[in-house]
Swiss-Prot record:
Name of the protein in question: Sensor protein BceS
Top-level lineage group: Bacteria
Subcellular location: Cell membrane
Organism: Bacillus subtilis (strain 168)
Residue ranges, Cytoplasmic side: 1-12, 56-334
Pfam families membership: HATPase_c
Catalytically driven reaction(s): ATP + protein L-histidine = ADP + protein N-phospho-L-histidine
Keyword list, A-Z: ATP-binding, Cell membrane, Kinase, Membrane, Nucleotide-binding, Phosphoprotein, Transferase, Transmembrane, Transmembrane helix, Two-component regulatory system
In-chain residues carrying the UniProt-annotated modification Phosphohistidine: 124
Single GO molecular function: protein histidine kinase activity
Gene: bceS
EC class of the enzyme, as a word: transferase
Amino acid sequence: MIKAFLIERRSWIAAFLFQQALMLFIAFVDPSISFGNVLYMVYLCILFFIIFLWFRYRKETAFYKSLKTWENNLDVTAINEPETPFEAMVERSIAGQTEHLKQTAARHRLALENEKDELMAWIHEVKTPLTAMHLIIDRMEEKALKSQLSYEWLRIHLLLDQQLHQKRISFIENDLSVEFIQLQPLIFKEIKDLQSWCIQKGIGFDIQLEAKEVLSDAKWLAFIIRQLLTNAVKYSEASEIEIKSFQKGEQTQLQVKDCGRGIDPKDVPRIFDKGFTSTTDHHDQASTGMGLYLAKKAAAPLLIHIDVESEFGAGTVFTLTFPIRNQFEHVISV
């Protein structure tokens, strides 16, 4: 701030120093003027000018320092009262800009809310014909066509479900109902929903649930597990997916292990990034790069930690670590 102040006042400083140099020059060339007396006056003037600059620095920069607070929260009351006409002009301009920004932000929030409501309404509307399509597919007798249509129906269903949860996830804290959940029925339901896809790809499941229940939100935990299972099925062929739960110390862990293509080591730190698919399979148009991102985002307010271990070409293990009860007290209170 001092450097900026001196740069701002450089014309003042240059003019003052030129004036003092001129006085010394005149005293030097004019023998009738005592050079020592003029030098003493110049010394006093410079000392006074330094004190004056320090006083003006303290006074003038107080207003501009208060602008830093305004930048963080757009609160005009945080700005110091202007003490000069120029500061008053700045304050009026900032107040006008603040009001404009707040109105613009309010309009954008309203537009986003309307867009979210319209999209969610559309998704719910689409679910009606999807349900009818599923009933029609179930009554089909030609097995090959039925299997293919069931797979395509499932893809649409999963994409709609992902989109629906993506819009809801911003308000997840208002949508939590934390309770003890039985893992077996929850996992079995998710596997059943993927049945047609798994049959088509020749995938089975090896389920070993030593830990029977966890403390979480049933709907959002199901969504997280759904993303891990769809990810495992998508990248596996003719193999088994292992699902295990067990106690590790005071915490419960749930593992989903596949024998698929695995993840390139350089991609592992990025798999939870929004929109990231892969650096090795850009031809894969089916991947959206949203499933694991949403799973990670949904896990955070539930205090679920997601770890991943992968060997490229050999498979991947995702581990969910659930919190103990006393870690969950503030979430339960929500």
